[in-house]
Amino acid sequence: MREAICIHIGQAGYQIGNACSQLFC
């Protein structure tokens, strides 16, 4: 679930997706 969210956010904004990846993924 979290991985899918990270991918979705990454599509919206690479910087936000990268931050999410560091925090959750």
UniProtKB/Swiss-Prot annotation:
Enzyme Commission number(s): 3.6.5.-
UniProt protein name: Tubulin alpha chain
Quaternary organization: Dimer of alpha and beta chains. A typical microtubule is a hollow water-filled tube with an outer diameter of 25 nm and an inner diameter of 15 nM. Alpha-beta heterodimers associate head-to-tail to form protofilaments running lengthwise along the microtubule wall with the beta-tubulin subunit facing the microtubule plus end conferring a structural polarity. Microtubules usually have 13 protofilaments but different protofilament numbers can be found in some organisms and specialized cells.
The entry's keywords: Cytoplasm, Cytoskeleton, GTP-binding, Hydrolase, Microtubule, Nucleotide-binding
Recorded superkingdom: Eukaryota
Protein family membership: Belongs to the tubulin family.
Catalytic activity: GTP + H2O = GDP + phosphate + H(+)
Species of provenance: Leptomonas seymouri
Catalytic class of the enzyme: hydrolase
UniProt-listed InterPro entries: Tubulin/FtsZ_GTPase_sf
Binding residues annotated for GTP, in chain numbering: Q11
Gene Ontology CC entries for this record: cytoplasm; microtubule
